[in-house]
Amino acid sequence: NSYLDNVDIKSKQEGGSYFENILAIGEAAMQYTASLQGTPVDKTKWLMYPYTVNACYSATENDITFPAAILQPPMYDVNASYEENLGAIGYVIAHEITHAFDNNGAKFDENGNAADWWTKEDYAEFEKRCEKLVYFYDGQEGIPGVTMDGRLTLSENVSDQGAVQCITEVVSRLENPDYKKLYRS
């Protein structure tokens, strides 16, 4: 039984419009989500379709989703070197794991509940480091003519930095690491 079963979609001939139908679907989705408040999390529901080439972390579920479609070239290739796969899919995995500890994920415990689990000292140091990232990225030109707001991009910047640090440390343990392949993949 889908939350869409009760959505009244109207064709143009019935006086409906694409915009109104999208609003009705969005409203039904919000009502469905609100109805889940206080119920156990259904771990069988995925946040993405298997054919989506992406990945995501959900702090409220403490869950990482890697759809099957991401496990193909160029993100993962059985014929690629260890460094190339680490620089591609390894980076994505490390990035999503780091979201559990970014400025948003840091506010949730291992069960996905909003909780203050840091020591005061650790959280103060974490915030200090986050401010450095905000300062670094603030005003950077992401694309020509468009500057970034370091505060708005903080979550992604923390996860990017964590992922780069992670894959760099892993590849540094190899006997003859090929950093060029790692960073170009």
Language-model regions, residue ranges each:
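Intrinsically disordered, low-complexity linker/terminal regions across diverse proteins
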Residues: 1-185
